[in-house]
Amino acid sequence: MAKTILAARKHIKKQVVDGIAHIHASFNNTIVTITDRQGNTLGWATAGNSGFRGSRKSTPFAAQVAAERCAEAVKDYGIKNLEVMVKGPGPGRESTVRALNAAGFRITNITDVTPIPHNGCRPPKKRRV
């Protein structure tokens, strides 16, 4: 009986020059997603899956580590320029942008896309600590 040899097909990653970094910085976590211009996800990382748990997720250092891991995940695509979209009021807003810049990306512009309600839903009650 003849054996069929299955050739493992190597997945060739397309080369993308320009990308968009979507940063969602909430009070509890930071999510970094890098997409191409059409919005197709190339890689992502969060403070939670970078090894931080509990209140350590909501630190600027955790956001920095998440940005570095996301940059490492998409380096095979050959991205040179990044447009940064920041959403949310969290502590990881600034450190994430600094980490992406330090990872070797040229940041073309930074846009704040935080949704601001025109008097929509009622906000959560104030905390009493």
From Swiss-Prot:
Annotated keywords: Ribonucleoprotein, Ribosomal protein, RNA-binding, rRNA-binding
Annotated InterPro entries: Ribosomal_uS11, Ribosomal_uS11_bac-type, Ribosomal_uS11_CS, Ribosomal_uS11_sf
GO annotation (BP), single: translation
Coiled coil: none
GO cellular component, one term: ribonucleoprotein complex
Alphabetical list of PROSITE patterns matching this protein: RIBOSOMAL_S11 (PS00054)
Highest rank taxon of the organism: Bacteria
Cell membrane keyword on record: no
GO molecular function: rRNA binding; structural constituent of ribosome
Presence of the UniProt keyword Nucleotide-binding in the record: no
Function: Located on the platform of the 30S subunit, it bridges several disparate RNA helices of the 16S rRNA. Forms part of the Shine-Dalgarno cleft in the 70S ribosome.
Family: Belongs to the universal ribosomal protein uS11 family.
Oligomeric form and interacting partners: Part of the 30S ribosomal subunit. Interacts with proteins S7 and S18. Binds to IF-3.
NCBIfam families membership: PRK05309.1, uS11_bact
HAMAP family (alphabetical): Ribosomal_uS11
Name this protein carries in UniProt: Small ribosomal subunit protein uS11
Organism, scientific name: Baumannia cicadellinicola subsp. Homalodisca coagulata
